[in-house]
Amino acid sequence: MSKQTLVLLYGGRSAEREVSVLSAESVMRAVNYDKFLVKTYFITQMGQFIKTQQFSEKPSESERLMTNETIELTQKIKPSDIYEEGAVVFPVLHGPMGEDGSIQGFLEVLRMPYIGTNVMSSSIAMDKITTKRVLESIGIPQVAYTVYIDGQDLEACLVETLARLTFPIFVKPANMGSSVGISKAQTKVELRKAIQLALTYDSRVLIEQGVVAREIEVGLLGNDKVKSTLPGEVIKDVDFYDYQAKYVDNKITMAIPADVDQSIVTEMRSYAEVAFKALGGCGLSRCDFFLTQDGQVYLNELNTMPGFTQWSMYPLLWENMGLAYPDLIEELVTLAQEMFDQRESHLI
């Protein structure tokens, strides 16, 4: 039986490229090599596409994907050279230029099926401010927030923010994930510095009320018919779950399934599925919630390309539902092909 080609794109231009490499290495080891041939391409910080490795069988645990230190620049290709008839692309890319609709649009121009949400839902979900406004409009609870746009009067924004919110306050670049560029502010001075830091990552900044809450996550899978997982909980050994805690210090553990009341489980799964459909989602997403001590649920964000590392919540949530990592990848490939066929049929 001939194998289907699975094209892995990893690296990328965003500050989350290191997470992308970790995710892609986990995917390449989880693939069912009886069914797939894996071809990998590294995208540099400058946006160059480099042909790297090919795997016809499971690589050893010691084998690593080629990155900046090991790539061969002689293998630089035109981005369109990744095209292969019948192949499916897994863009294991996080953050801007990865899960913001950019690469999705490129793959649609190439007429290649790809895993993940489409151009519209990727771009909306990537922007925290736009996502909050969409979810507010359909009645899904949001933590109180204000917005700062680069070039506006910063002092006026601080006055407005302190009139509406109380410390602690979290400041986030609108278009960034993996907690990159996020700060916790306890004073006006810290708030100003946090906004200035966020502006180094994006021109639009979300300023959000801090809440004492548990962090609960729900996995989503599907196209027209969406399935959700039982929720899992991120249990922190630190006050603030930032990039360092997530990916460097490993100062988190996970409880899967989360120990929450059944009514809360039902509410979260319903909100997750409704939000996914409202944003035009397809393929997959991870929906992140806050759960306060008094039982208030807030939907924090939808992550359209969640981490796929061996310790990432998304694959572990599905494993808890009985869907093993290799089978999850196969399901994602099937969904990608289904959406490709649907898009193509609408262009005729």
From Swiss-Prot:
Cofactor notes: Binds 2 magnesium or manganese ions per subunit.
Reaction it catalyzes: 2 D-alanine + ATP = D-alanyl-D-alanine + ADP + phosphate + H(+)
EC number annotated for this UniProt entry: 6.3.2.4
Binding site residues for Mg(2+) 1: D288, E301
Co-factor requirement: Mg(2+); Mn(2+)
Gene3D superfamilies according to UniProt: 3.40.50.20, ATP-grasp fold, A domain, ATP-grasp fold, B domain
PANTHER family to which the protein is assigned, alphabetical: D-ALANINE--D-ALANINE LIGASE, D-ALANINE--D-ALANINE LIGASE A
Protein name according to UniProt: D-alanine--D-alanine ligase
Gene name as annotated: ddl
